Amino acid sequence: IRMFSEVEAERIVSVFVSESFALENANENLLAKVHYEVVEDKIFNKMSDTQTPQGILAIVQKKEYSIEDMILPGNQSCILFLEGIQDPGNLGTMIRTGEGAGISGVIMSKDTVDLFNPKTIRSTMGSIYRVPHLVSDDFLGCILEFQKKGGRVYATHLLENMNIKSLIMPK
């Protein structure tokens, strides 16, 4: 419900609500501003990919971004480059955590799990609406372009460990 309330109205294509959701008075304000279709609870449950759906589904138009949308003036950009992430929940959590850390965007390699997987979307907890993102056919090219524009690149891997607080990061 929270994610639905955060999406920009002009990006909403269709809205479907369960009968029980439509009957709850607490949802009147949420539904007042959109056209929606009421669906029998039994059918709604089949439409949803979760075991206990909240009663509202929306088809939302994707927003297209470029790397330029992520490059901030004054060398303030912090782009999260993700390569080959396979778990949808992990991808969504990384995007959500990145937003909390102040990233200006996310660039993913094309072998990363689908950003629009329902589990990924849910685990972003709305960050997908606020953080510019793109999937790149030229992942290395994006990293090089970011460096060319003054960005600093830090990498992680599973074979070593270091406390992120020990890094000297630019202000």
Short names for language-model regions:
Residues I1-K171:
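Post-transcriptional modification and biogenesis factors for structured RNAs
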